[in-house]
Amino acid sequence: MHRLALALLALCLATGAASAQSDWPTKPVRFIIPFPGGSFSDITIRIIQKKLGPRLGQAIVIDNRSGASGDIGSDVVARAAADGYNFGIATNSTHSVSPALNPKLPYDPLKNFAMVSLVGEAPYVLITRPDLPAKSLQELITLAKAKAGAVSYASVGPASLAHLAGELFSQMAGVTLTEVPYRSSAQSVLDTQSGRIDMQFGTMAPVLPHVLSGKVKALAVTSLKRAAVLPDVPTLDESGLKGFEASLWLAVVAPGKTPPAIVERMNREVRAVLADPEVVEALRKQGIEATPTTPAELRERITQDIAKWKKLAQETGISMDTEATGSIPAKK
């Protein structure tokens, strides 16, 4: 009799849990963004928010928790209640670069999160000063090889993805660049435009107007496919650096023990939103290409990225504490 009562209780609890998940969501859903308002992540999720809320039948509440290159907000997501009402935004910074370079990270990017879907990617643009005597990537490499350190490179933020892109370029091209550190990407673009700096990897949205106006030259983009907003600009991969990829990406994740049924539902809704032509166009205006995935595909992407940046860090000695040295040496 006691066993029968326990079995009935377990059945009731399971039925109740299944019912709660099938009725989800019954209240507003929180999205924790580990970066401030106006950031790449914030702009992207607010574009998604307009369509995702109505599809779920509940409001999407944006909660910006910035600090420590996104690590603080990501830790908040990892520790949040796994009840289906807390989701987070993951980026290269929080889920591949930091894990690869920071052994003291308070969260595990794979174990502490349930993967939902990749949302979008935004390649960097390799731009040069307008009068640099190089019209292609190969001409730039030839110029840099002619004299070590002759080509200057703007690096914004130590151990940032843009910094790692420069390290990867130097390594794969076999060149040595003179590194000039900047605190502001806006200032570095202006200095490239004025000729004070030879080249840099610039974020798509802010550099696009300068490229289209001819104030800087765009030699290549860092994605494996050409950017829709710059269809005539080749990728570094097709320009001779086979396999080069260093795009900004953004994804939706949840606390690790979030019920699979809720994760699957959120994945379906995010993918549906990213198929909406209005959303695709709004993202594209920000230099972002919609790139929805399955949870498994997102997990594989993060796993591969961590391995890539960890390998680069080991080979170059770069870390979260790296200070600009004035040059980026080629791999020997």
Locate each region found by the language model.
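Stable alpha-helical elements in mature extracytoplasmic
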Residues: 40-44, 48, 69, 73, ...
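N-terminal (or domain-start) structured segment
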Residues: 20-111, 150, 174-199, 210, ...
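An extracytoplasmic/periplasmic, membrane-proximal ligand-sensing/linker region
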Residues: 26-28, 172, 212, 260-332
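Hinge/capping helix and adjacent helix->loop/strand transition within the periplasmic-binding protein
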Residues: 52, 79-85, 92, 100-187, ...
